[in-house]
Amino acid sequence: MGLASTVSLALLGLCSLARAQTSAADAYVSAESPIAQAGILANIGPSGSKSHGAASGVIIASPSTSNPDYLYTWTRDAALVSRALVDEFIEGESSLQSVIDSYVSSQQKLQRVDNPSGSYTSGGLGEPKFNIDLTAFTGAWGRPQRDGPALRAITLITYGNHLLSSGNTSYVTDTIWPVVKADLDYVVSYWNQTGFDLWEEVSSSSFFTTAEQHTALRLGATFATAVGASASTYLTQADNVLCFLQSYWNSNGGYATANTGGGRSGIDANTVLTSIHTFDIEAGCDSVTFQPCSDRALSNLKVYVDSFRGLYSINPTGATDPILTGRYKEDVYYNGNPWYLTTFAVAEQLYDALNTWDKLGSLDVTSTSLAFFKQFDSSITAGTYASSTSEYATLTSAIRNWADGFLEVLADFTPADGGLTEQIDKSSGNPTSAADLTWSYASAITAFKARGGAIPASWGAAGLTVPATCSTGGGGGSGGDTVAVTLNVQATTVYGENIYVTGSVNQLANWSPDNAIALNADNYPTWSVTVNLPANTQIEYKYIRKNNGQVTWESDPNRSITTSASGSFTQNDTWR
């Protein structure tokens, strides 16, 4: 029996079905909130009860050391978890300030740890994970991952802006700004280069990464001005990134394509997480920035949820029932299960949308979002519905109940002690994969807060327009059309050794071994990477090995390819 069922069993017999559903969600929020909060704090060093050995301020992904081993700190996870804590601090949880300050200090140190992705000034900020004692993890991994610096910048700027409003300028300018500036400069330099996605599996351009990079640059420009620094570069590149962000939209399918590579459908929780983590209520239902109530984000949400119908035997079977969702339907990791954090994200997007409609006093139904709204009113047509209309009341009430339904199905599969793992077994319903996943706890907190009407700080999304002319210039891009080139190389390696590629164009780091592009070893001994390269261009390149700081180049001569005018192709090589 799930946690909420245990808590609210007596209540359910006293209420109508609709009220019982709400009571179940209420009970789950009430019971799980303190458990999730404690779960986060237990996973933060040095004094967290489940984070023994972690340095001060280090947020571990999970205390699990086997099947899987997640006893590391990921820049992405830590930034998202810290953002949840920062939002709570801003809302009045003053006891969290020391925890947040410790996180800031840990990131100061972590940025300067040399690692397989590079150093502080040569790409090392894109390293995805570190040991919990703030030393480099040197094993094979999907690196670099370029969302981490952007997410960390967003978290620290949000914290810094609040401190500035309270008059604490010296800490912001002396401590927070240098960390933020390094991350923003990394984004400027690398936003138009490929990297691994948030699931650490696909090396390409990623919707989530691009959106977070845009948010970081936009927020960073304002923050730079506030501390007396130059903002022009951040603003210029923010416009370019916003332009690139539009390219992910699949108008035929009605969803945002999660990755430009990977060979999957592109329907992915990546996109739902994008919507909630770039939420800015001041932007209303703007589709350019993929706001939660925008027609594109709502269409995308329906396509994403529907992709899991019939996939997991533990799920309800109704055509519009709230269900458990996973990362993407083709997932095979741990046999491909639903995840807590992805299902919480669905509910959170819906609550964010409801909060925005309440603020606006109306909602719009467009041809893009019509299929989403027809789930709740089959007779609804495109148009604007004021909050005074019966249609508005019908739709928003049904959508709130639907959002609560996702919490209720999560409650059914939350153990009685409230502990949240990474995944839920798709057949048995038992918790599986990493125990006490910090990101799972944070996703519960942010969904619950959104349900209660919490609104995160604005980041400047209101009123943005896509530039008439888009550029990939600045930060390693060369502009013009590109084609996706997959490079495969057969290479046997020793433990700790990784394969990279560099070459004669910016996208291949201009022959820089420090900034060379990492290949992944998912199909070892074949190492692979997909890179967007200039079209109709002759390009020279070589593979290199890196091991304990030592670089070994392939033998001469340089390899050479001539890219096509459009499309994509694969180049198969063997190390020499």
Swiss-Prot record:
Active site: residue positions: D197 (proton acceptor), E200 (proton donor)
Keywords annotated in UniProt: Allergen, Carbohydrate metabolism, Disulfide bond, Glycoprotein, Glycosidase, Hydrolase, Polysaccharide degradation, Secreted, Signal
GO molecular function: glucan 1,4-alpha-glucosidase activity; starch binding
InterPro entries: 6-hairpin_glycosidase_sf (IPR008928), 6hp_glycosidase-like_sf (IPR012341), Carb-bd-like_fold (IPR013784), CBM20 (IPR002044), GH15-like (IPR011613), Glucoamylase (IPR000165), Glucoamylase_active_site (IPR046966), Glucoamylase_SBD (IPR008291)
Pfam family, one: Glyco_hydro_15
Enzyme Commission number, as recorded: 3.2.1.3
Reactions catalysed, as given in the entry: Hydrolysis of terminal (1->4)-linked alpha-D-glucose residues successively from non-reducing ends of the chains with release of beta-D-glucose
Name this protein carries in UniProt: Glucoamylase ARB_02327-1
Glycosylation site positions: N168, N192, N558, N572
GO biological process: polysaccharide catabolic process
Record's GO cellular component terms: extracellular region; fungal-type vacuole
Domain of life of the organism encoding this protein: Eukaryota
Disulfide bond positions: C243-C470, C285-C293
Region (Disordered): 552-576
Lineage of producing organism: Eukaryota, Fungi, Dikarya, Basidiomycota, Agaricomycotina
Family membership noted in the UniProt record: Belongs to the glycosyl hydrolase 15 family.
Positions of the CBM20 domain: 477-576
List of residues binding substrate: W141
Subcellular location: Secreted
Leader sequence residues: 1-20
